[in-house]
């Protein structure tokens, strides 16, 4: 229900919203009435509409939400008039006006209601508060009457006469209430009348409730189902206070002048419903309550409600780089526009999110952490908003990040081994290149990005980087990647002293043993050479030598045993828990479901078994690592003993404790257990009953009545024996029963015998590091006693898991070290140890709670009253979790163990730090964990710094994007400090009011200033503003000057000696203005603060920068402002890019019109660099001297006789530094072009020439062979002695194919040789 009243809560609400709400008010036009009939204004009415801050070209008048008329004046103006004339029945209605700006029509003005003739319009009534939010501040009540020269009357409920009146010259009266007090509370209205007609009154304004806030504690405001919903969905806002019978009110900060929602309470709370949300319902809501005397509470915390159909996009950044070396840690930083919303990290290919950040830790800038990354962590990651309620809002992701893990198998070389360097990007590339910084000539190319580096003779070590090029720009290479250093093997740590000593003893004893053995052999060899009378001496020597050898061996064993060795704990698969649930508490056997839960996060399935019948069912593990086995109504077939197992990938757990179902009308038999009874100490007896909501009774054998009884306390109960003495010994059992009478009882448990035995004192037991660990950590337990030669047993949750044998060679204390190499999620729990000798055991040690974190979402940690405390005072740290029934631990950075433990029935606990001192200063965090399932814990809360001091640390004020901005631009002032959870306040020099940011949940406060105007110029500072009463001193921040540019002619900026300077030299910026008596400001792009300011006597300021460095490179400009108008500055000067380097950047080289020569055409090569005043030179491959010089960088290349073809590059030098040349540009190749006919002729000529060469070479070979034969034949002819020589034709049968018919003589002879005489 909407009550048509307004309420003042003196908390300066709209000041909290800063300039945002102010800008919104300024953009609303003003509407009023003028008439030339002062005694009867309805006879002739003109409506005026005025723009608040700018001229406009169009104005629009609306009546009853429909367009009535619009005016387009011939020139832009601030205000226009709409003539109405005499007021008649047709003219009555609701009027508003708008004006046109660059974004469209403005917001409508306030509604003017014209009623019947003879009546004045009803005035508008609202509040303005400009003072601090406590009784005693000043309040202005504003009444707007629409007409000028009216009499304004202020009335208060309970008074017949007006309490105040005014006759202003305008249309509005301001009634001031100074020093607000409780008697000023109540309901106010205002009325107007014409001065000449005191009997003609207007209608009363809407009533206004004046509530003095801060007299009651603030309520809490929550949203259901959540604070972020889609349009059309329903929302319920619940306001809850500590006091019954109050009236509750809901306000929206964006509409403070609109009526508020109010509700009568339901006990001490009220619900505000929104059936179908709209996007304009987005805003900041708060609530309060008040009594019948209008005494109000403090405002609740502001609750931001988002109504949107699409989430704003999130972005994801990787630190230090998306290409990460294996084994390192990586941070994935996720951010978005929404704060107070959970975030989830997703990996492509994975169904479930990898990590979560809860809503309380999301401040718009958060990080997920991947530790000790491997190649399994490589992939494409994205982050999304994570909601715990259902909604139809679409999720959007701005970007994804591909994480690349490089250097396989590591970045440490072993001589003779190889390492694969992997260069990766998230898009297709043409080719990768690998550079080695130690060798300039080294370069490798790869298509897939894998480079194999060998380390022969240790020569592969060094620093490598890679780059790539894409197909569309094949001549352009990317920037180099971050360098990766490959190093040789080195000592990465120190061996433990025990290991060094152990190894030294082994080597020493081995040398002694070998020496003595050689001595015995030498004596035996001598035996053969000695006389018999010396044999007894030899025997004695041999005996002594053997005795020494035996003693050495014995010492070896004793020395090795004297060293304390670490005993690795082989953790068994955790035992699951089995219990029963029912929806019939008085008759649970009517419907029973068995549940099995495992503490191990890697459990895949659960198996339920029944004794005598074996396997019953298998169920997959849920997200809570549990499974349900419904049995239904119990029958005789269900009776028996049940237990369950959990299955992992390679192991099956031990069976759970047996749950015995006896039958109908009888509850399952409970299980009883207790710790070791120790004389004179307290003893707790545990009775586990399998069902929720049961009563428990403890019995002692020989007594009929229960020894102790407990009501419904869950599935288990603990009976306490305050002091264990001899009379308490005996056999105990326990039973369970239903909560309500008539009781249904269980069978008695198995008996438990309690006997007090003689015991040694308990050992000293601790962990070497903190017992709060992350999965994968290394944990060592140290158990020791002052007694000698003791054996040790390590227990987890009362079960033995490891043991240590006695050490005989070490006098003094006995110690055992138990080691968990890599802690799993199921390894948490309560650990203890005992020691024993042959017959006597020790008392159990004090338990150590090993908490394995990162299983549940992290809690939040807050300090009350605040994180800054005076020495000697108390502070309460509240740890707020998510789940009920958890146990909480408080940790301090640098402390070995948690400071405090507490168990909670709700979701939060309070840790008290009493009388804090300097030693309590530091970072605190908390964690919660469940004690029933291996101490599975949450992530650690965000650290909270506790300051023990009498003075707040000084914050720092900065501007984003810069403190020098143009008129109309938006700027955000950031107040940053190390103290968390404290509000900030922003001061402007010369103004009494301040902008406040309440309940900051981060360590920085944002103060946005929208649409910078002349009123925004000034000097600002900020300080902390704690929301608790504290005597701690507050220091102001630095002073920031907000300068607005664009109001004076721009100056000129020069630099001497030039835009490029060698590191270590000096440079001077000269800023020349046009007006005298000016202050000059030097600016650098990318920095938020000015570099330097000067007030010279003339028109120019010289900014001297001595010994410049590389980081001084950048883009500079300057502005100036007059002393008569400080901080109202000129336009920016021209920008100057400064290079501080001894090697100018390389230029670019391009060809026009193309890189292909055409017949008779030239090509112009264009060399361009980033610096002015340079000389360019063009180089052609193959020519020693540069070819051409040019000041403008243009080179004309001709192709006479094909001399223009080839690779070109260019470089330049500054005229101020003629000896310093830049790097050469990337090479550019010019090629020639031939027509199709010429190309075909060329190819034909090449083919023909090749054939001619082959033929000529073949003929030459044949002629050479024949030439060699000729002298040999001639010599044989001279040696025939007159006989005819014959040439045997042995190849005659080879003229035809074998086996074919032929007419040759050879075929008839069938292979017989035929000789034919040939004259030579």
Swiss-Prot record:
Residue ranges of every copy of the Ig-like C2-type domain listed in the record: 29-113, 115-212, 224-308, 312-399, 401-482, 572-665, 662-756, 761-853, 857-942, 949-1044, 1049-1134, 1145-1226
Extracellular side: 19-504, 556-1320
TM ranges: 505-525, 535-555
Disulfide pattern: 49-97, 334-383, 423-466, 783-833, 879-926, 1071-1118, 1167-1210
A GO MF label: coreceptor activity
Cytoplasmic membrane side: 526-534
UniProt tissue specificity: Expressed in pituitary gland, testis and liver. Isoform 2 is expressed pituitary gland and testis.
BP GO terms, sorted: immune response-regulating signaling pathway; negative regulation of activin receptor signaling pathway; regulation of DNA-templated transcription
GO cellular component: extracellular region; membrane
Keywords: Disulfide bond, Glycoprotein, Immunoglobulin domain, Membrane, Receptor, Repeat, Secreted, Signal, Transmembrane, Transmembrane helix
Residues making up the signal peptide according to the UniProt record: 1-18
Cited SUPFAM superfamilies: Immunoglobulin (SSF48726)
InterPro entries reported in the protein's UniProt record: Ig-like_dom, Ig-like_dom_sf, Ig-like_fold, Ig-like_Receptors_ImmuneReg, Ig_sub, Ig_sub2
Residues linked to a glycan: 44, 329, 365, 372, 591, 731, 782, 830, 874, 923, 970, 1011, 1066, 1131, 1207
Family annotation (Pfam families): Ig_2, Ig_3
Quaternary context: Interacts with INHA; the interaction is not confirmed by standard receptor binding assays. Interacts with ACVR1B; the interaction appears to be ligand-dependent as it is diminished by inhibin B and activin A. Interacts with ACVR2A, ACVR2B, ACVRL1 and BMPR1B. Interacts with HECTD1.
Function in brief: Seems to be a coreceptor in inhibin signaling, but seems not to be a high-affinity inhibin receptor. Antagonizes activin A signaling in the presence or absence of inhibin B. Necessary to mediate a specific antagonistic effect of inhibin B on activin-stimulated transcription.
Name of protein: Immunoglobulin superfamily member 1
Gene: Igsf1
């Amino acid at each position: 229900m909407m009550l048509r009243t307004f309420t003042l809560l003196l908390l300066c609400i709209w000041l909290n919203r800063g300039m945002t709400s102010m800008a919104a008010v300024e953009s609303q036009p003003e509407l009023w009435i003028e008439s030339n009939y002062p005694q009867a204004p309805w006879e002739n009415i003109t409506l005026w509409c005025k723009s608040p801050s700018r001229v406009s070209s169009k104005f629009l008048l609306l009546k009853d939400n429909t367009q009535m008329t619009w005016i387009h004046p011939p020139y832009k103006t601030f205000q226009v008039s709409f003539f109405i004339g005499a007021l008649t029945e047709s003219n009555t209605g609701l009027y508003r006006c708008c004006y046109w700006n660059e974004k469209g029509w403005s917001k409508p003005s306030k509604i003017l209601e014209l009623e019947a003739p003879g009546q004045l319009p009803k005035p508008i009534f609202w509040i303005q508060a400009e003072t601090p939010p406590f009784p005693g501040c000043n309040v202005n009540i504003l009444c707007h009457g629409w007409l000028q020269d009216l009499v304004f009357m202020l009335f208060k409920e309970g008074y017949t006469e007006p309490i105040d009146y005014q006759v202003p010259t305008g249309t509005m009266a301001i009634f001031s209430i100074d020093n607000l007090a409780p008697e000023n509370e109540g309901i106010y209205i205002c009325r107007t009348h014409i001065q000449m007609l005191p009997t003609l009154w207007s209608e009363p304004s809407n009533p206004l409730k004046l509530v003095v806030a801060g007299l009651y504690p603030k309520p809490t405001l929550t949203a259901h189902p959540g604070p972020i919903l889609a349009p059309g969905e329903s929302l319920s806002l619940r306001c809850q206070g500590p006091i019954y019978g109050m009236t509750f009110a809901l306000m929206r900060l964006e509409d403070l002048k609109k009526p508020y929602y109010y509700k009568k309470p339901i006990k001490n709370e009220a619900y505000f419903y929104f059936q179908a949300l709209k996007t304009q319902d987005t805003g900041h809501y708060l609530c309060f309550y008040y009594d019948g005397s209008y005494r109000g509470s403090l405002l609740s915390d502001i609750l931001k409600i988002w109504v949107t159909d699409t989430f704003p996009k999130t972005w994801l950044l990787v630190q230090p780089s998306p290409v990460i070396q294996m084994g390192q840690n990586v941070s994935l930083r996720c951010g978005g526009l929404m704060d107070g919303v959970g975030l989830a990290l997703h990996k492509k290919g994975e169904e479930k999110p990898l990590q979560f950040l809860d809503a309380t830790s999301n401040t718009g800038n958060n990080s997920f952490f991947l530790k000790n990354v491997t190649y399994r962590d490589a992939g494409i990651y994205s982050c999304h908003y994570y909601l715990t309620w259902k909604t139809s809002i679409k999720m959007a992701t701005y970007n994804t990040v591909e994480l690349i893990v490089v250097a396989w198998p590591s970045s440490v070389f072993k001589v003779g081994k190889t390492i694969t360097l992997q260069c990766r990007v998230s898009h297709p590339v043409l080719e990768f290149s690998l550079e080695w910084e130690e060798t300039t000539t080294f370069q490798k190319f790869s298509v897939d990005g894998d480079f194999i580096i060998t380390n022969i003779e240790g020569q592969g070590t060094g620093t490598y980087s890679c780059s790539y090029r894409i197909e569309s720009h094949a001549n352009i290479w990317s920037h180099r990647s971050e360098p990766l250093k490959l190093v040789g093997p080195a000592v990465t740590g120190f061996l433990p002293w025990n290991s060094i000593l152990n190894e030294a003893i082994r080597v020493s004893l081995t040398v002694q043993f070998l020496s003595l053995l050689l001595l015995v052999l030498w004596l035996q060899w001598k035996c053969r050479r000695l006389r018999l009378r010396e044999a007894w001496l030899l025997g004695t020597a041999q005996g002594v030598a053997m005795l020494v050898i035996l003693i050495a061996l014995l010492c070896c064993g004793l020395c090795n045993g004297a060293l304390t060795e670490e005993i690795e704990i082989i953790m068994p698969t955790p035992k699951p828990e089995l219990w029963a649930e029912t929806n019939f508490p008085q008759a649970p056997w009517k419907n029973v479901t068995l549940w099995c839960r495992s503490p191990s996060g890697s459990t895949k399935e659960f198996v339920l078994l029944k004794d005598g019948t074996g396997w019953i069912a298998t169920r997959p593990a849920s997200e809570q690592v549990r499974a349900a086995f419904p049995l239904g109504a119990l029958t005789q077939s269900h009776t028996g003993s049940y237990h369950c197992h959990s299955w992992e990938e390679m192991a099956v757990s031990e069976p759970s404790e047996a749950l015995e179902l006896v039958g109908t009308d009888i509850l399952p038999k409970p299980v009883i257990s207790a710790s070791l009874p120790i004389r004179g100490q307290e003893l707790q007896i545990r009775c586990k009953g399998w069902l929720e909501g049961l009563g428990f009774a403890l019995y002692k054998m020989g007594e009929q009545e229960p020894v102790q009884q407990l009501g419904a306390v869950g599935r288990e109960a603990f009976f306490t024996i305050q002091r264990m003495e001899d009379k308490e010994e005996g056999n105990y059992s326990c039973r369970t029963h239903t909560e309500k009478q008539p009781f249904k009882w269980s069978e008695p448990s198995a008996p438990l015998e309690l006997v007090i035995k003689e015991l040694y004192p308990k050992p000293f037991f601790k962990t070497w590091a903190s017992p709060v660990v992350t999965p994968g950590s290394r944990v060592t337990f140290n158990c020791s006693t002052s007694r000698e030669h003791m054996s040790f047993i390590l227990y987890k949750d009362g079960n033995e898991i490891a043991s240590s044998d006695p050490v005989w060679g070490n006098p003094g204390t006995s110690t055992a070290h138990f080691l968990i190499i890599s802690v799993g999620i199921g390894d948490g729990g309560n650990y203890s140890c005992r020691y024993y000798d042959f017959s006597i055991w020790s008392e159990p040690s004090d338990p150590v709670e090993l908490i394995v974190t990162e299983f549940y979402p992290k809690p939040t940690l807050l300090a009350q009253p605040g994180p800054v405390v005076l020495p000697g005072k108390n502070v309460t740290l509240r740890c707020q979790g998510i789940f009920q029934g958890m146990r909480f631990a408080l940790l301090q950075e640098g402390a070995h163990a948690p400071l405090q433990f507490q168990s909670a029935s709700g979701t939060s606990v309070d840790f008290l730090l009493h009388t804090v001192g300097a030693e309590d200063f530091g970072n605190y965090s908390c964690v919660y964990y469940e004690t029933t399932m291996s101490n599975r814990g949450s992530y650690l809360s965000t650290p909270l710094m506790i300051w023990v001091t009498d003075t707040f640390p000084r914050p720092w004020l900065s501007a984003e994007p810069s403190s020098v901005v143009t008129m109309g631009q938006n700027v955000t002032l950031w107040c940053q400090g190390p103290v968390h959870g404290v509000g900030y306040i922003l001061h402007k020099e010369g103004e009494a009011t301040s902008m406040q940011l309440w309940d900051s949940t981060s360590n920085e406060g944002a103060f946005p200033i929208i649409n910078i105007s002349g009123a925004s110029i000034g000097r600002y500072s900020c300080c902390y503003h704690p929301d608790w009463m504290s005597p701690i001193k507050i220091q102001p921040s630095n002073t920031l000057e907000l300068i607005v540019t664009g109001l004076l002619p721009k100056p000129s900026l020069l630099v001497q000696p030039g835009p490029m300077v060698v590191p270590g030299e000096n440079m001077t910026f000269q800023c020349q203005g046009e007006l005298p008596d000016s202050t000059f400001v030097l600016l650098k792009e990318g920095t938020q603060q000015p570099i330097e300011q000067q007030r010279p006597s003339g028109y120019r300021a010289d900014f001297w920068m001595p010994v410049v460095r590389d980081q001084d490179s950048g883009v500079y400009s300057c502005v100036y402002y007059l002393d008569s108008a400080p901080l109202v500055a000129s336009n920016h000067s021209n920008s100057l890019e400064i290079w501080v380097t001894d090697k100018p950047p390389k230029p670019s080289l391009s060809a026009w019109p193309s890189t292909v020569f055409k017949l008779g055409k030239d090509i112009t090569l264009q060399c361009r660099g980033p610096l002015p005043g340079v000389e360019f030179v063009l180089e052609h491959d193959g020519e020693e001297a540069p070819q051409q010089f040019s000041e403008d960088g243009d080179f004309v290349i001709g192709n006479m006789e094909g001399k223009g073809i080839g690779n070109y590059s260019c470089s330049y030098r500054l005229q101020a530094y003629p000896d310093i040349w830049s790097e050469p540009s990337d090479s550019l190749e010019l090629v020639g072009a031939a027509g199709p006919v010429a190309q075909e002729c060329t190819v034909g000529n090449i083919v023909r020439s090749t054939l001619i060469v082959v033929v000529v070479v073949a003929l030459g070979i044949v002629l050479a062979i024949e030439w060699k034969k000729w002298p040999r034949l001639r010599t044989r002819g001279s040696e025939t002695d007159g006989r005819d020589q014959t040439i045997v034709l042995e190849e005659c049968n080879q003229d035809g194919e074998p086996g074919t018919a032929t007419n040759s003589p050879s075929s008839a002879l069938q292979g017989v040789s035929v000789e034919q005489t040939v004259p030579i």
